[in-house]
């Protein structure tokens, strides 16, 4: 069994057999470790052992972070490979901590703070807006680059995108429509690329925490197994080459987000996104949806919150639904009758 499959298997056992607290911790660690793949990084066996001790309640997340930090401080003869592993280990532990925290504020300042907390001591510019323009060669674009925001317009662009999103109303939208909009928002702020490095990981953590404010339960499998796909999907959402018939599209990102928060089963393959890929039989826009007692894709967020509680407890009373969701009794009755 490969090292990658080994950590996935070991952490999955806590989800299958663990207590509720262990499940939540394991999911956070799986997402945290999987996200390192967006920059081609892999975590160490020591990180996995530390994660397991945290999941089992033997140490706190702060103690886990201190262990990882101390482990690398003692290893003064590190190779370049170990330096990359150090970054992956430290950042994984920090992501796990952030995902375990309920606190969140929707603002550019929050995104900058997340970046600082993830990369402080790893990058000298953690949490700081870049002061120069950048390009990045992308495999999915045959070596071409996305056009990122100019460094001197980053702050204004961030403020505009966040203000626009804050004013956007999700009321009466189906969950599927919400996914499309969230994918577009994620691709827009990622294109700004406000940081010198670590943009995709910071974007992922920010979006996970933002989506949780809507009541979505994030499926850790998506980031655990498809982090590089996530990055390539962001790239394709922001790249045009009209001369060669290539248009920016969020369809790949929408499929990823749909798997992430709705539990759909789109096949996420990086080769499908390559600009040279041609397939007339590309998978349908209609996904495979796991069997459920209700169609979540057509629900509004308000309806989904109520239906999820009914699905978990079919005998739940209307007054309990009112208390759990904060909705009015008339709203709860309307949803139950629809």
Q: Which residues does each PLM region occupy?
A:
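FIC/Doc superfamily catalytic core
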Residues: 1-338
């Amino acid at each position: 069994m490969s090292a990658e499959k080994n950590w996935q298997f070991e952490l999955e056992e806590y989800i299958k057999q663990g207590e509720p607290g262990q499940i939540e911790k394991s999911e956070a660690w799986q997402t945290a470790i999987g996200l390192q793949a967006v920059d081609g990084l892999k975590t160490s066996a020591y990180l996995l052992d530390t994660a397991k001790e945290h999941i089992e309640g033997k140490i706190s997340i702060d103690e886990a972070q201190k262990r990882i930090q101390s482990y690398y401080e003692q290893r003064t003869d590190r190779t370049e490979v170990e330096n990359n592993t150090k970054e992956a280990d430290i950042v994984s532990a920090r992501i796990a901590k952030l995902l375990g925290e309920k606190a969140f504020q929707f603002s550019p300042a929050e995104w900058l703070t997340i970046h600082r907390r993830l990369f402080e001591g790893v990058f000298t510019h953690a949490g700081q807006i870049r002061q120069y323009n950048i390009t990045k060669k992308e495999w999915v674009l045959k070596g071409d680059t996305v056009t990122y925001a100019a460094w001197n317009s980053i702050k204004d662009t961030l403020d505009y995108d966040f203000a626009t999103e804050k004013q956007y109303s999700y009321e009466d939208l189906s969950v599927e429509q919400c996914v499309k909009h969230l994918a577009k928002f994620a691709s827009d702020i990622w294109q700004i690329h406000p940081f010198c490095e670590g943009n995709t990981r910071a974007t992922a953590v920010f979006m996970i925490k933002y989506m949780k404010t809507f009541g979505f339960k994030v499926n850790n499998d998506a980031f655990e197994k498809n982090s590089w796909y996530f990055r390539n999907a962001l790239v394709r959402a922001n790249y045009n080459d009209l001369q060669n018939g290539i248009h920016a599209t969020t369809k790949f990102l929408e499929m990823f987000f749909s798997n992430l928060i709705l539990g759909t089963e789109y096949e996420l393959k990086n080769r499908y996104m390559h600009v040279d890929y041609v397939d007339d039989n590309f998978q349908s826009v209609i996904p495979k949806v796991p069997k459920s007692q209700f169609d979540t894709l057509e629900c509004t967020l308000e309806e989904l919150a109520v239906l999820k509680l009914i699905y978990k407890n079919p005998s739940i009373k209307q007054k309990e639904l009112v208390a759990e969701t904060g909705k009015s009794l008339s709203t709860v009755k309307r949803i139950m009758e629809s």
